[in-house]
Regions:
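Active-site neighborhood of divalent metal-dependent phosphoester bond hydrolases
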Residues: 129, 224-226, 238-322, 329, ...
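ATP-dependent NMP and nucleoside kinases share a basic, alpha-helical "lid"
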Residues: 43, 47, 69, 82-122
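Short hydrophobic beta-strand that contains or immediately precedes a catalytic carboxylate
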Residues: 185-187, 231, 260-262, 322-323
Length: 337
């Protein structure tokens, strides 16, 4: 069994005292990735069990988390986190730094947690504490997705915890640091298909007509020197042939000869195709008329293509960021929490 978390994420360990959160964190994460509420309590009071120091401890905990997320570092919160109210402040931090929140819940049987606490001389504070925490967890656990967690994992037994072999760190969709180009970055085509074909040929791309397999739209585009196009949005509107531009971009993205990020015109078209109320101005009316001449199947393909576009890409070992109309540095390479 494995758990997958985004490479840049805020991971909340959730569980009552004695559920094994600290042991879990030590086993699966690096030492400095884990921010412990107990350690923070000790820092501000010299006693990890001093409950009167909890408010100060969580001020320190949130400060450390904010600095780590600001610096683009995966961070794990080792605290009970059994109350939705407690998790809310941490989710707010994740959103502030455009980081995806993940919950790993250790929902072990109450008796197991009680027995473990009785074996710890510094934590034997009575079974009623575990019972209350367990009730709080039970009340709130079903609402984790609604709270804003992007991924949730619930481990309900010691066996499940012990059978966890690996926590896999997944790259964000916008992370293409391994691609080094050369790149040809093309923006604001606005339905001008013929001009785009001329430009691609001038840049050395070979454009061939092939059998239409339903995804290549009868086009095959490649560069003999393995250059790659990055379309920087605004594929549609204003020009005479937005559907052909879409087919070109969709075919090239499918084959790997191009990447594409959306522009505001593309996002507006997506809203319209999904039935949202938008103003048919700035060329959108013409695009809708052009699309209406084609098949319903193609319109479905366009909807799926636009839905799958990523806001920006980070390329070339982090030296290049590509987005329509720019992106603030602190948002580069981030996800939306």
């Amino acid at each position: 069994m494995e758990i997958k978390v985004p490479q840049l994420s805020l991971v909340l360990l959730v569980g009552v005292s004695g559920s094994g959160k600290s042991t879990f964190a030590k086993k699966h994460f690096k030492k400095h990735e884990v921010v412990s509420s107990d350690i923070c309590r000790g820092i501000v009071s010299n006693d990890e069990n001093d409950q009167s120091a909890t408010n100060d401890a969580f001020d320190v905990l949130k400060y450390i988390i904010s600095k780590r997320l600001k610096n683009g570092l995966l961070t794990v919160v080792d605290a009970t986190n059994v109350k939705a109210e407690s998790r809310k402040a941490l989710i707010r931090l994740a959103r502030e730094f455009h980081t995806l929140p993940v919950a790993i819940v250790l929902d072990l049987p109450q008796r197991v947690c009680e027995d473990r606490n009785e074996e710890r001389a510094d934590r034997n504070f009575g079974r009623h504490v575990i019972r209350n925490q367990k009730l709080q967890l039970k009340r709130s656990i079903k609402g984790l997705k609604r709270e804003g967690f992007r991924k949730m994992y619930i481990l309900k037994s010691e066996e499940e915890v012990n059978n966890l072999t690996e926590i896999v760190r997944e790259k964000l969709y916008n992370d293409k640091r391994e691609l080094h180009g050369p790149f040809d970055i093309i923006g604001d085509i606005h339905g001008c298909y013929d001009e785009t074909i001329l430009l691609l040929k001038k840049l050395g791309y070979v454009i061939s007509t092939v059998d239409n397999d339903g995804k290549n739209y009868g086009l095959a585009v490649h560069h003999p020197e393995n250059r790659q196009v990055i379309f920087v949005g605004d594929l549609v509107d204003r020009g005479p042939n937005s559907p052909a531009v879409l087919k070109l971009a969709m075919s090239m993205v499918k084959s790997g000869s191009a990447l594409c990020v959306p522009g505001n015109h593309d996002l507006k078209l997506q809203k319209k195709l999904n039935g949202k109320k938008v103003q048919l101005n700035h060329g959108l009316a013409e695009t809708m008329e052009q699309l209406a001449r084609g098949s319903a199947e193609f319109i479905t393909d366009v909807k799926e293509f636009l839905y799958g576009l990523i806001s920006h890409y980070i390329l070339d070992d982090g030296k290049l960021a590509v987005a329509h109309a720019g992106i603030k540095e602190e948002m580069q390479g981030r996800g939306s929490g």
